[in-house]
Protein backbone atom coordinates (compact mmCIF):
# COMPACT_ATOMS: atom_id res chain seq x y z
CA UNK A 1 0.00 0.00 0.00
CA UNK A 2 1.40 3.38 -1.00
CA UNK A 3 1.75 6.26 1.46
CA UNK A 4 -1.02 8.05 -0.43
CA UNK A 5 -3.33 5.07 0.08
CA UNK A 6 -2.56 5.04 3.81
CA UNK A 7 -3.22 8.77 4.04
CA UNK A 8 -6.59 8.41 2.31
CA UNK A 9 -7.61 5.56 4.61
CA UNK A 10 -6.68 7.62 7.68
CA UNK A 11 -8.63 10.60 6.34
CA UNK A 12 -11.71 8.44 5.78
CA UNK A 13 -11.52 6.98 9.29
CA UNK A 14 -11.25 10.51 10.69
CA UNK A 15 -14.26 11.61 8.64
CA UNK A 16 -16.34 8.79 10.12
CA UNK A 17 -15.22 9.01 13.73
CA UNK A 18 -14.75 12.74 14.20
CA UNK A 19 -16.86 14.49 11.57
CA UNK A 20 -20.12 12.54 11.34
CA UNK A 21 -19.52 11.06 7.89
CA UNK A 22 -22.15 8.48 7.09
CA UNK A 23 -24.22 7.14 4.24
CA UNK A 24 -27.57 8.75 4.85
CA UNK A 25 -29.75 6.32 2.91
CA UNK A 26 -29.61 3.09 0.95
CA UNK A 27 -32.83 2.87 -1.05
CA UNK A 28 -33.94 -0.16 -3.03
CA UNK A 29 -36.12 0.75 -5.99
CA UNK A 30 -38.63 -1.91 -7.03
CA UNK A 31 -40.71 -2.05 -10.22
CA UNK A 32 -44.32 -3.03 -9.48
CA UNK A 33 -45.78 -2.77 -12.98
CA UNK A 34 -45.90 -6.55 -13.35
CA UNK A 35 -48.19 -6.74 -10.30
CA UNK A 36 -50.91 -4.42 -11.62
CA UNK A 37 -54.36 -5.99 -11.26
CA UNK A 38 -57.95 -4.70 -11.47
CA UNK A 39 -58.92 -6.37 -8.20
CA UNK A 40 -57.68 -4.22 -5.27
CA UNK A 41 -57.22 -7.15 -2.90
CA UNK A 42 -55.21 -9.17 -5.40
CA UNK A 43 -53.18 -6.09 -6.29
CA UNK A 44 -52.36 -5.46 -2.64
CA UNK A 45 -51.43 -9.08 -2.02
CA UNK A 46 -49.23 -9.35 -5.12
CA UNK A 47 -47.46 -6.05 -4.38
CA UNK A 48 -46.74 -7.04 -0.81
CA UNK A 49 -45.39 -10.43 -1.90
CA UNK A 50 -43.04 -8.88 -4.44
CA UNK A 51 -41.66 -6.30 -2.02
CA UNK A 52 -40.98 -8.96 0.60
CA UNK A 53 -39.41 -11.20 -2.03
CA UNK A 54 -37.08 -8.54 -3.47
CA UNK A 55 -36.32 -6.59 -0.29
CA UNK A 56 -36.45 -9.35 2.30
CA UNK A 57 -32.68 -9.33 2.78
CA UNK A 58 -32.14 -5.59 2.37
CA UNK A 59 -31.72 -4.67 6.03
CA UNK A 60 -29.47 -7.65 6.78
CA UNK A 61 -27.24 -6.96 3.77
CA UNK A 62 -26.96 -3.25 4.55
CA UNK A 63 -25.98 -4.00 8.14
CA UNK A 64 -23.36 -6.52 6.94
CA UNK A 65 -21.81 -3.94 4.61
CA UNK A 66 -21.94 -1.34 7.38
CA UNK A 67 -19.97 -3.64 9.69
CA UNK A 68 -17.45 -4.67 7.03
CA UNK A 69 -16.63 -1.15 5.86
CA UNK A 70 -17.06 0.60 9.18
CA UNK A 71 -19.27 3.21 7.53
CA UNK A 72 -22.48 4.10 9.39
CA UNK A 73 -25.59 3.70 7.21
CA UNK A 74 -28.44 5.64 8.75
CA UNK A 75 -31.58 4.65 6.82
CA UNK A 76 -32.76 1.69 4.78
CA UNK A 77 -35.60 2.54 2.43
CA UNK A 78 -37.70 1.29 -0.47
CA UNK A 79 -39.07 3.21 -3.45
CA UNK A 80 -41.73 1.71 -5.71
CA UNK A 81 -43.44 2.51 -8.99
CA UNK A 82 -45.93 5.37 -8.50
CA UNK A 83 -49.18 4.04 -7.09
CA UNK A 84 -51.23 6.08 -9.55
CA UNK A 85 -49.75 3.92 -12.32
CA UNK A 86 -49.76 0.56 -10.56
CA UNK A 87 -53.33 0.92 -9.28
CA UNK A 88 -54.89 2.49 -12.39
CA UNK A 89 -57.04 -0.50 -13.38
CA UNK A 90 -58.04 -1.17 -9.76
CA UNK A 91 -59.13 2.44 -9.33
CA UNK A 92 -61.26 2.17 -12.43
CA UNK A 93 -63.04 -0.80 -10.84
CA UNK A 94 -63.23 0.20 -7.17
CA UNK A 95 -62.41 3.92 -7.00
CA UNK A 96 -60.44 5.56 -4.20
CA UNK A 97 -60.67 2.53 -1.91
CA UNK A 98 -58.29 0.70 -4.26
CA UNK A 99 -55.38 3.03 -3.51
CA UNK A 100 -56.10 3.05 0.21
CA UNK A 101 -55.95 -0.74 0.21
CA UNK A 102 -52.66 -0.52 -1.66
CA UNK A 103 -51.30 2.06 0.80
CA UNK A 104 -52.00 -0.28 3.70
CA UNK A 105 -50.27 -3.17 1.91
CA UNK A 106 -47.21 -1.05 1.15
CA UNK A 107 -46.91 0.02 4.77
CA UNK A 108 -47.26 -3.57 5.97
CA UNK A 109 -44.57 -4.71 3.53
CA UNK A 110 -42.23 -1.97 4.72
CA UNK A 111 -42.75 -3.05 8.31
CA UNK A 112 -42.21 -6.72 7.45
CA UNK A 113 -38.85 -6.16 5.76
CA UNK A 114 -37.78 -3.66 8.42
CA UNK A 115 -37.13 -0.50 6.40
CA UNK A 116 -37.57 3.02 7.75
CA UNK A 117 -39.64 4.45 4.91
CA UNK A 118 -41.30 3.43 1.66
CA UNK A 119 -41.87 6.01 -1.07
CA UNK A 120 -44.12 5.86 -4.08
CA UNK A 121 -47.60 6.94 -3.03
CA UNK A 122 -47.17 9.30 -5.92
CA UNK A 123 -49.25 11.17 -8.49
CA UNK A 124 -47.54 12.51 -11.63
CA UNK A 125 -49.85 15.39 -12.50
CA UNK A 126 -47.61 18.07 -14.02
CA UNK A 127 -49.64 18.01 -17.26
CA UNK A 128 -53.03 16.80 -16.07
CA UNK A 129 -54.88 14.19 -14.05
CA UNK A 130 -55.82 10.59 -14.65
CA UNK A 131 -58.57 8.96 -12.62
CA UNK A 132 -55.92 7.15 -10.57
CA UNK A 133 -53.93 10.36 -10.04
CA UNK A 134 -57.01 11.98 -8.56
CA UNK A 135 -57.63 8.97 -6.32
CA UNK A 136 -54.08 9.14 -4.95
CA UNK A 137 -54.16 12.91 -4.48
CA UNK A 138 -57.54 12.86 -2.77
CA UNK A 139 -56.53 10.09 -0.35
CA UNK A 140 -53.08 11.33 0.71
CA UNK A 141 -54.19 12.70 4.10
CA UNK A 142 -56.07 9.50 4.93
CA UNK A 143 -53.23 7.28 3.68
CA UNK A 144 -50.60 9.11 5.74
CA UNK A 145 -52.78 9.13 8.84
CA UNK A 146 -53.29 5.37 8.56
CA UNK A 147 -49.65 4.40 7.99
CA UNK A 148 -46.29 4.84 9.67
CA UNK A 149 -43.70 4.41 6.91
CA UNK A 150 -45.50 5.39 3.70
CA UNK A 151 -44.32 8.59 1.95
CA UNK A 152 -46.41 10.54 -0.55
CA UNK A 153 -45.42 12.90 -3.33
CA UNK A 154 -47.19 14.94 -5.98
CA UNK A 155 -45.29 16.06 -9.08
CA UNK A 156 -47.05 19.35 -9.83
CA UNK A 157 -44.73 20.86 -12.44
CA UNK A 158 -42.08 20.08 -15.03
CA UNK A 159 -39.81 22.33 -17.07
CA UNK A 160 -41.21 20.81 -20.29
CA UNK A 161 -44.88 21.31 -19.45
CA UNK A 162 -45.10 24.15 -16.97
CA UNK A 163 -47.05 24.26 -13.71
CA UNK A 164 -50.38 22.52 -13.18
CA UNK A 165 -51.99 25.10 -10.92
CA UNK A 166 -54.98 22.88 -10.19
CA UNK A 167 -52.55 20.28 -8.85
CA UNK A 168 -50.75 22.94 -6.82
CA UNK A 169 -53.94 24.02 -5.07
CA UNK A 170 -55.14 20.47 -4.44
CA UNK A 171 -51.75 19.53 -3.04
CA UNK A 172 -51.93 22.50 -0.70
CA UNK A 173 -55.34 21.25 0.44
CA UNK A 174 -53.79 17.82 1.07
CA UNK A 175 -51.00 19.40 3.13
CA UNK A 176 -53.52 21.32 5.23
CA UNK A 177 -55.73 18.29 5.84
CA UNK A 178 -52.76 16.05 6.61
CA UNK A 179 -51.59 18.54 9.22
CA UNK A 180 -55.02 18.60 10.83
CA UNK A 181 -55.28 14.80 10.88
CA UNK A 182 -51.76 14.16 12.25
CA UNK A 183 -51.04 17.23 14.41
CA UNK A 184 -48.60 18.37 11.73
CA UNK A 185 -46.24 15.41 11.93
CA UNK A 186 -47.59 13.58 8.88
CA UNK A 187 -46.56 16.46 6.62
CA UNK A 188 -42.95 15.28 6.92
CA UNK A 189 -44.02 12.38 4.68
CA UNK A 190 -45.64 14.55 1.99
CA UNK A 191 -43.87 16.62 -0.64
CA UNK A 192 -44.76 18.62 -3.76
CA UNK A 193 -42.17 18.18 -6.52
CA UNK A 194 -41.02 19.86 -9.73
CA UNK A 195 -38.74 18.08 -12.23
CA UNK A 196 -38.83 15.04 -9.97
CA UNK A 197 -35.85 12.69 -10.34
CA UNK A 198 -36.84 9.04 -10.73
CA UNK A 199 -33.85 7.63 -8.87
CA UNK A 200 -33.38 9.62 -5.68
CA UNK A 201 -32.84 7.70 -2.44
CA UNK A 202 -34.19 10.57 -0.33
CA UNK A 203 -37.67 10.76 1.15
CA UNK A 204 -40.36 11.89 1.00
CA UNK A 205 -40.00 12.29 -2.77
CA UNK A 206 -38.49 8.94 -3.74
CA UNK A 207 -40.29 6.76 -6.27
CA UNK A 208 -39.10 4.14 -8.76
CA UNK A 209 -39.50 5.63 -12.24
CA UNK A 210 -40.94 3.66 -15.14
CA UNK A 211 -37.62 3.98 -16.99
CA UNK A 212 -35.70 2.32 -14.16
CA UNK A 213 -34.63 -1.35 -14.07
CA UNK A 214 -36.57 -4.13 -12.37
CA UNK A 215 -34.77 -3.32 -9.12
CA UNK A 216 -31.79 -1.15 -8.25
CA UNK A 217 -29.96 0.36 -5.30
CA UNK A 218 -29.57 4.13 -4.98
CA UNK A 219 -27.41 5.70 -2.29
CA UNK A 220 -27.61 9.07 -0.57
CA UNK A 221 -24.40 10.43 0.92
CA UNK A 222 -24.02 12.80 3.84
CA UNK A 223 -20.96 14.72 4.98
CA UNK A 224 -21.78 18.30 6.04
CA UNK A 225 -19.59 17.83 9.11
CA UNK A 226 -16.64 16.82 6.95
CA UNK A 227 -17.03 19.81 4.63
CA UNK A 228 -17.51 22.14 7.60
CA UNK A 229 -14.21 20.98 9.10
CA UNK A 230 -12.42 21.69 5.82
CA UNK A 231 -13.94 25.17 5.58
CA UNK A 232 -12.97 26.01 9.17
CA UNK A 233 -9.35 25.05 8.47
CA UNK A 234 -9.21 27.42 5.48
CA UNK A 235 -10.40 30.73 6.89
CA UNK A 236 -7.79 32.86 5.12
CA UNK A 237 -7.70 31.34 1.62
CA UNK A 238 -9.29 32.86 -1.48
CA UNK A 239 -12.57 31.59 -2.92
CA UNK A 240 -11.01 29.50 -5.69
CA UNK A 241 -8.80 27.64 -3.23
CA UNK A 242 -11.75 27.06 -0.92
CA UNK A 243 -13.81 25.78 -3.85
CA UNK A 244 -11.04 23.34 -4.82
CA UNK A 245 -10.72 21.95 -1.29
CA UNK A 246 -14.46 21.43 -0.95
CA UNK A 247 -14.42 19.73 -4.34
CA UNK A 248 -11.68 17.30 -3.23
CA UNK A 249 -13.59 16.51 -0.06
CA UNK A 250 -16.79 15.83 -2.00
CA UNK A 251 -14.82 13.44 -4.21
CA UNK A 252 -13.81 11.35 -1.17
CA UNK A 253 -17.29 11.36 0.33
CA UNK A 254 -18.81 10.21 -2.96
CA UNK A 255 -16.31 7.37 -3.28
CA UNK A 256 -17.51 6.02 0.05
CA UNK A 257 -21.14 6.21 -1.08
CA UNK A 258 -20.48 4.40 -4.34
CA UNK A 259 -18.52 1.65 -2.59
CA UNK A 260 -21.43 1.02 -0.23
CA UNK A 261 -24.01 1.09 -3.02
CA UNK A 262 -22.17 -1.29 -5.32
CA UNK A 263 -21.53 -3.78 -2.54
CA UNK A 264 -25.15 -3.79 -1.37
CA UNK A 265 -26.44 -4.14 -4.94
CA UNK A 266 -24.09 -7.02 -5.69
CA UNK A 267 -25.18 -8.98 -2.62
CA UNK A 268 -28.86 -8.39 -3.30
CA UNK A 269 -28.41 -9.47 -6.91
CA UNK A 270 -29.81 -6.22 -8.33
CA UNK A 271 -28.38 -3.35 -10.34
CA UNK A 272 -26.50 -0.45 -8.80
CA UNK A 273 -28.36 2.72 -9.68
CA UNK A 274 -26.87 6.04 -8.64
CA UNK A 275 -25.23 8.07 -5.90
CA UNK A 276 -27.17 11.17 -4.92
CA UNK A 277 -24.43 13.74 -4.25
CA UNK A 278 -26.59 15.83 -1.92
CA UNK A 279 -25.15 17.02 1.37
CA UNK A 280 -27.82 15.86 3.82
CA UNK A 281 -27.64 17.44 7.28
CA UNK A 282 -28.97 16.13 10.60
CA UNK A 283 -30.04 17.83 13.83
CA UNK A 284 -26.69 16.84 15.36
CA UNK A 285 -24.41 19.76 16.17
CA UNK A 286 -21.63 20.05 13.61
CA UNK A 287 -23.58 18.21 10.90
CA UNK A 288 -25.08 21.32 9.38
CA UNK A 289 -25.10 22.90 5.92
CA UNK A 290 -25.91 26.27 7.51
CA UNK A 291 -22.72 26.06 9.56
CA UNK A 292 -20.71 25.42 6.38
CA UNK A 293 -22.12 28.62 4.91
CA UNK A 294 -21.31 30.51 8.08
CA UNK A 295 -17.79 29.10 7.94
CA UNK A 296 -17.44 30.50 4.43
CA UNK A 297 -18.08 33.94 5.89
CA UNK A 298 -21.66 34.61 7.00
CA UNK A 299 -22.46 36.06 10.41
CA UNK A 300 -25.72 34.09 10.32
CA UNK A 301 -27.16 31.93 7.55
CA UNK A 302 -29.81 33.98 5.79
CA UNK A 303 -27.94 37.28 5.86
CA UNK A 304 -26.93 38.98 2.57
CA UNK A 305 -24.43 36.79 0.74
CA UNK A 306 -26.08 33.52 1.76
CA UNK A 307 -27.21 32.65 -1.76
CA UNK A 308 -23.71 33.26 -3.16
CA UNK A 309 -22.11 31.14 -0.43
CA UNK A 310 -24.56 28.32 -1.13
CA UNK A 311 -23.79 28.54 -4.85
CA UNK A 312 -20.06 28.17 -4.16
CA UNK A 313 -20.71 25.15 -1.94
CA UNK A 314 -23.06 23.48 -4.40
CA UNK A 315 -20.84 23.95 -7.43
CA UNK A 316 -17.85 22.48 -5.61
CA UNK A 317 -19.80 19.50 -4.26
CA UNK A 318 -21.32 18.67 -7.65
CA UNK A 319 -18.03 18.93 -9.52
CA UNK A 320 -16.16 16.87 -6.94
CA UNK A 321 -18.88 14.26 -6.72
CA UNK A 322 -19.26 13.97 -10.48
CA UNK A 323 -15.53 13.33 -10.80
CA UNK A 324 -15.82 10.48 -8.29
CA UNK A 325 -18.63 8.57 -9.97
CA UNK A 326 -20.25 8.29 -13.37
CA UNK A 327 -23.45 7.15 -11.66
CA UNK A 328 -24.64 10.31 -9.99
CA UNK A 329 -28.37 10.94 -9.86
CA UNK A 330 -31.27 12.06 -7.73
CA UNK A 331 -31.11 15.67 -6.56
CA UNK A 332 -27.32 15.94 -6.17
CA UNK A 333 -27.43 19.31 -4.41
CA UNK A 334 -27.19 20.63 -0.85
CA UNK A 335 -30.23 20.12 1.33
CA UNK A 336 -31.28 23.03 3.52
CA UNK A 337 -34.16 21.58 5.57
CA UNK A 338 -34.94 23.82 8.50
CA UNK A 339 -35.92 21.30 11.17
CA UNK A 340 -33.38 18.65 10.12
CA UNK A 341 -30.42 21.03 10.27
CA UNK A 342 -29.62 22.47 13.71
CA UNK A 343 -27.84 25.42 12.09
CA UNK A 344 -30.79 26.20 9.81
CA UNK A 345 -33.20 25.99 12.75
CA UNK A 346 -31.02 28.42 14.68
CA UNK A 347 -30.78 30.72 11.65
CA UNK A 348 -34.59 30.74 11.39
CA UNK A 349 -34.58 32.45 14.79
CA UNK A 350 -32.01 35.00 13.56
CA UNK A 351 -31.40 36.16 9.98
CA UNK A 352 -33.27 33.55 7.92
CA UNK A 353 -36.74 34.45 6.64
CA UNK A 354 -39.01 32.34 4.46
CA UNK A 355 -38.43 34.74 1.57
CA UNK A 356 -34.63 34.50 1.86
CA UNK A 357 -34.89 30.72 2.08
CA UNK A 358 -36.81 30.74 -1.20
CA UNK A 359 -34.05 32.81 -2.82
CA UNK A 360 -31.44 30.32 -1.64
CA UNK A 361 -33.38 27.44 -3.19
CA UNK A 362 -32.75 28.96 -6.61
CA UNK A 363 -29.17 27.66 -6.42
CA UNK A 364 -29.80 24.30 -4.75
CA UNK A 365 -32.37 21.56 -5.07
CA UNK A 366 -35.15 20.35 -2.81
CA UNK A 367 -36.44 23.83 -2.03
CA UNK A 368 -38.61 24.80 0.93
CA UNK A 369 -37.97 21.75 3.08
CA UNK A 370 -39.17 20.89 6.59
CA UNK A 371 -40.34 24.43 7.18
CA UNK A 372 -42.85 24.84 10.02
CA UNK A 373 -45.50 27.53 9.60
CA UNK A 374 -48.47 28.54 11.77
CA UNK A 375 -51.33 26.06 11.84
CA UNK A 376 -53.81 28.67 10.61
CA UNK A 377 -51.83 29.36 7.42
CA UNK A 378 -54.46 29.49 4.62
CA UNK A 379 -54.51 26.94 1.81
CA UNK A 380 -53.97 29.79 -0.69
CA UNK A 381 -50.72 30.77 1.02
CA UNK A 382 -49.45 27.18 1.03
CA UNK A 383 -50.38 26.94 -2.65
CA UNK A 384 -48.48 30.16 -3.33
CA UNK A 385 -45.34 28.80 -1.67
CA UNK A 386 -45.58 25.59 -3.71
CA UNK A 387 -46.14 27.55 -6.93
CA UNK A 388 -43.17 29.84 -6.28
CA UNK A 389 -40.85 26.85 -5.88
CA UNK A 390 -42.36 25.22 -8.95
CA UNK A 391 -41.65 28.39 -10.94
CA UNK A 392 -38.00 28.31 -9.85
CA UNK A 393 -37.78 24.69 -11.00
CA UNK A 394 -39.45 25.33 -14.35
CA UNK A 395 -37.21 28.30 -15.14
CA UNK A 396 -33.91 26.78 -13.96
CA UNK A 397 -34.58 23.16 -14.91
CA UNK A 398 -33.57 22.07 -11.41
CA UNK A 399 -35.52 19.69 -9.17
CA UNK A 400 -37.35 21.72 -6.53
CA UNK A 401 -39.79 20.76 -3.82
CA UNK A 402 -41.91 21.95 -0.93
CA UNK A 403 -42.26 20.00 2.31
CA UNK A 404 -44.08 22.37 4.61
CA UNK A 405 -45.63 21.72 8.01
CA UNK A 406 -48.59 23.79 9.20
CA UNK A 407 -48.38 23.14 12.95
CA UNK A 408 -51.86 23.20 14.52
CA UNK A 409 -52.13 25.64 17.39
CA UNK A 410 -48.65 27.08 16.82
CA UNK A 411 -47.77 30.72 16.15
CA UNK A 412 -44.61 32.39 14.78
CA UNK A 413 -41.75 31.98 17.23
CA UNK A 414 -43.12 28.83 18.86
CA UNK A 415 -41.03 25.67 18.65
CA UNK A 416 -42.25 22.51 16.95
CA UNK A 417 -40.66 19.18 17.82
CA UNK A 418 -40.54 16.46 15.14
CA UNK A 419 -38.17 14.04 16.87
CA UNK A 420 -35.27 11.91 15.66
CA UNK A 421 -33.63 12.87 12.38
CA UNK A 422 -36.57 15.18 11.64
CA UNK A 423 -35.40 17.47 14.44
CA UNK A 424 -37.12 20.59 15.71
CA UNK A 425 -37.65 24.08 14.34
CA UNK A 426 -39.15 27.45 15.18
CA UNK A 427 -42.45 28.29 13.54
CA UNK A 428 -41.63 30.74 10.75
CA UNK A 429 -43.74 33.76 9.93
CA UNK A 430 -45.64 33.93 6.64
CA UNK A 431 -47.17 36.89 4.86
CA UNK A 432 -50.63 37.97 5.97
CA UNK A 433 -51.48 38.71 2.34
CA UNK A 434 -53.13 35.89 0.41
CA UNK A 435 -52.51 35.04 -3.26
CA UNK A 436 -56.14 34.96 -4.37
CA UNK A 437 -54.97 34.22 -7.93
CA UNK A 438 -54.82 30.56 -6.96
CA UNK A 439 -58.57 30.34 -7.25
CA UNK A 440 -58.02 30.39 -11.02
CA UNK A 441 -57.98 27.12 -12.96
CA UNK A 442 -55.45 25.91 -15.51
CA UNK A 443 -51.71 25.90 -16.04
CA UNK A 444 -48.79 28.28 -16.17
CA UNK A 445 -46.90 27.44 -19.39
CA UNK A 446 -43.23 26.43 -19.48
CA UNK A 447 -40.58 29.03 -20.12
CA UNK A 448 -39.73 30.04 -23.67
CA UNK A 449 -36.60 28.13 -24.75
CA UNK A 450 -33.46 30.17 -25.18
From Swiss-Prot:
Cysteines engaged in disulfide bonds, as pairs: none
Entry-linked CDD domains: RNR_PFL_like_DUF711 (cd08025)
SUPFAM superfamilies: PFL-like glycyl radical enzymes
Superkingdom as given in the UniProt entry: Archaea
Family: Belongs to the UPF0210 family.
Entries under HAMAP family matching the protein: UPF0210
NCBIfam families cross-referenced by the UniProt entry: PRK05313.1
Stated name of the protein: UPF0210 protein MK1214
